Amino acid sequence: MKKVRLNGSHIKSLDEIIISGSKSESNRVLILKSIFQNISIINLSSSDDTKILEKNLNSTDFNLNVGHAGTAMRFLTAYLATLENKKFHLSGSKRMNERPIGILVKALNDLGFNINYIGNEGFPPIEIIGCKNLKNKVKL
């Protein structure tokens, strides 16, 4: 398998990314596509988790719901925090809202992002107020 290390300058010059179709690769490439809109994706997974992430990334709604998709919850938490001057409520199914997200939220807040719990501390749903991060290091 050929390995490619991507950085911003490489991605900006890409037209398309061909992936294996795995859910893991698909979710990661969807985040890249949200940052670099010129990319087209070949062989995107048809999994429910990937569809949920793609739907939420393309939504113009303030209230986002990931259902049972844990990867979408975590990826969206980090991605939405970077969208300056935008506010979101991110939630999931009853079961998703019982799954801890505190370590990720603390790390992002320690970097200068603005994420708050709407209900129970350490668990979704969360409010995300997008901003520019102020730090580049965090201790976990």
Predicted feature descriptions by range:
Residues M1-L140:
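Structural preference for solvent-exposed beta-strand-turn elements
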